[in-house]
Design a protein with these regions (language model features):
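A short helix/loop element that forms part of the nucleotide-sugar donor recognition site in Leloir-type
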Residues: 171-187, 321
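Short hydrophobic beta-strand element within catalytic cores of glycosyltransferases
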Residues: 277-281
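A charged, aromatic-enriched C-terminal amphipathic alpha-helix characteristic of glycosyltransferases
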Residues: 318-352
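Conserved acidic donor-binding segment of nucleotide-sugar-dependent glycosyltransferases
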Residues: 292-304, 311-318
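Carbohydrate-associated surface elements
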Residues: 142, 164
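Short alpha-helical donor nucleotide-sugar binding micro-motif in glycosyltransferases
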Residues: 241-242, 248-252
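Aromatic "clamp/platform" in nucleotide-sugar-dependent glycosyltransferases that forms part
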Residues: 260
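Conserved donor-binding/catalytic core segment of Leloir-type glycosyltransferases
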Residues: 137, 188-204, 210-213
């Protein structure tokens, strides 16, 4: 089947770039070789050999012009070469299937930021992305609601498809292996260890967590993986950037999501699939799909709520009943890559029929 994917890059990074790589892997498993149009590629990835790569160079352009220029070039290439159906992970008016993994108005509101001129441009491009596409794929109900509220997208046009996770990579390990992982990371056994995976600390709520861990008397430790932190505190440790984040999920006792804006939060699902429950802010997109002992929910605007959630987590840890024995039962959807990719293929087939 002829398919095209667009994104800012095809490389091992967070968020939407990791999602694009996952789509390529899923399509490869179905013997589909897509055309991928991006600003940059990591040619050392095995996935690079599974695609027809088309690079749109934006080197030398001011940063604020790069996305509009990429959109303009992408539209011209698609029209000239009859590429498609186009699954657009980046914001572009060329999309046939527009992936909605976040909205810029939603981000600005959550972060209490006043829109600047560059934000107005981003919102305008996002509006084109969502309104011109034949279908919008929302990665959470929160994103579906924001697409309706901020961009006037009709509910009938939106398809809710929670993002996929590589179930082979993110899976539990036995107790002995987990103990070795904890030892390798030098995690204490006399404290409940909470993980924050973050490359944007303000949005991810590090300040909130730092205040909590500074004042708590519970036997706890917060470890941070991702961007370096500038906090020195006895209960907080930095683990660095991790290419083996699945082993960190397995080793810790809980993952914590305290984001001011979290359209989905794939780390929540990845953590659960590794057998590790999540302490999660109630507004996070992944809170929609975490079930039972897979989650402990708290309210971002209520410090007492976070205190209660952490106390519940520590109590379960002390009782030795915090691990998730059956991860699939702690999720409200099937996160397999195959299911997600086949859903996108179904939409692409409908695009062709129109």
């Amino acid at each position: 089947m002829k398919l095209c994917i667009s994104n800012h890059g095809l490389r091992p990074s967070g968020g939407i770039e990791r999602y694009a790589l996952t789509l390529v892997r899923g399509l490869h498993a179905l013997a589909i070789r897509p055309t991928v149009i991006a600003k940059t590629f990591d040619a050392n990835l095995p996935e690079y050999g599974w695609i027809d790569a088309r690079r749109i160079r934006v080197t030398g352009l001011p940063s604020k012009w790069r996305d509009p220029y990429f959109d303009w070039r992408l539209r011209r290439i698609k029209a000239r070469e009859d590429l498609g159906p186009l699954i657009a992970c980046n914001q572009t008016g060329a999309a046939d299937i527009a992936i909605c993994g976040s909205t810029h108005p939603g981000f600005l509101a959550a972060m209490a930021q006043t829109p600047r001129r560059s934000d107005v441009w981003k919102i305008a491009l996002e509006h084109e992305h969502l309104t011109r596409a034949q279908f919008v794929v929302a990665h959470s109900q929160r994103m579906a609601d924001e697409a309706v509220r901020h961009h006037g997208i009709t509910a009938e046009k939106i398809h809710l498809m929670y993002p996929p996770v590589d179930g082979d990579r993110f899976a539990p390990v036995d107790d002995d292996t987990r103990a070795r992982l904890r030892e390798a990371l030098q995690l204490p056994n006399d404290k409940a260890v909470f993980l924050l995976a973050s490359t944007g600390h303000r949005r991810k709520g590090l300040d909130l967590l730092a205040r909590h861990f500074a004042r708590t008397t519970l036997p706890v430790c917060l470890v941070v993986a991702g961007r370096p932190i500038d906090i020195a505190a006895p209960h907080i440790r930095y683990l660095g950037y991790r290419n083996d984040i699945e082993n960190v999920f397995r080793a810790v006792d809980y993952t914590v999501l305290a984001s001011l804006y979290e359209p989905f939060g794939l780390v929540g699902v990845e953590s659960v699939l590794c057998g590790t429950p999540v302490v999660v802010a109630e507004g996070a997109g992944c809170a929609e799909v975490l079930r039972g002992n897979g989650r402990i929910v708290f309210a971002l605007d209520d410090a007492a709520s976070l205190d209660d959630a952490m106390a519940s987590a520590v109590a379960a840890w002390q009782a030795g009943r915090h691990r998730i024995a059956e991860p699939a039962q702690a999720l409200g959807y099937d996160p397999s890559v195959d299911v997600h990719v086949r859903g996108l293929i179904g939409l692409a087939q409908r695009v062709r029929q129109r």
